[in-house]
Amino acid sequence: VLKALIFAMLVPITAFASDINNVALVSSSTQFDDSQLPQIQQNLEQKGYSVSLQYLDQVISDFGYVNTDQKRAKDLIRALTDDNIDILWFVRGGGGALNLLPYLEQHKDGLKSAKPKVLVGFSDVTALHHFVNQELGWPSIHGVTAATNLKMGGFNQEPLPNISELLKNGVEYDYVLPLNDLAKTTKVNGTLVGGNHTLVAATFGTKYSYDFKNKVLLLEDVGVSFRQLDRLLQQILFLNQFDVNAVIFGQYYPADPTDPERLMYKTVLERFAQQLNKPVYYFPFIGHGKYNRPVILGHSVELSCKEEYCNLTQ
């Protein structure tokens, strides 16, 4: 952990060039629809990016992953160590990225000596965000995938972010809801980590566990019933070590929820917030919903409240 923290000090956001625009499309999880690739490439090029497809090699595995664990890891590591690449933009999430952690760990020394890259994605990509944040000290973007955003049509209405501007200017969001008194009265600072709750929880008690000290933990999920969410939150309460500075919850309710569903999920989160002796916040504009606001993982975040709502800045 100490080595990771030292390395993180060497790779601040200011270390990234102001005009990073060389994107490698990568996919390390569930199979993607390759008929979408021309539109994905066009969308990114219209935003001013130069796009490479050389690290996409889909031969669907028995589990429905893009390829075998070994091949997915090999392609990912090649992209991570390519000095001509600035950004790894994931085509989609799904499942299977957690399986790649042992391969990344084996190549950690080589990855540390590579030019830092910015990973962009969410959902299953959480496992890879965690590795580059904690082990390499690289910041990354929890945000829309290349196949799930406003430009692709469909349900998601979140536009593709400008990565250079995001790293230069940070983010600021109002209307973050405090879920307990500590959130209302405490000005919180820390390093933002986390992402998809299922992926974060999968590391609990393992050698890939999060170092929570001085962290603000972001959690969101989809396809989880309110009872399953209650169980996941009880697991957090039962952890032997959970010394976070704060917790931020994104969206958990279904993509097209009823008002009672929204209320039920919020009630479960509020109950947890009353049991945890840490500031807890709610911002359901991050996650698998209609909107998925970008945030910078592995980077400092501040939360402060005035009256009914709070403000998140990075």
At which residue positions do the language-model features occur?
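Internal helical hairpin/lid segments
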Residues: 208-265
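Conserved anion/nucleotide-ligand pocket segment
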Residues: 137-199
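N-terminal small/polar loop signature for handling phosphorylated ligands or for N-terminal nucleophile
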Residues: 57-114
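ATP/NTP phosphate-donor binding region
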Residues: 17-82
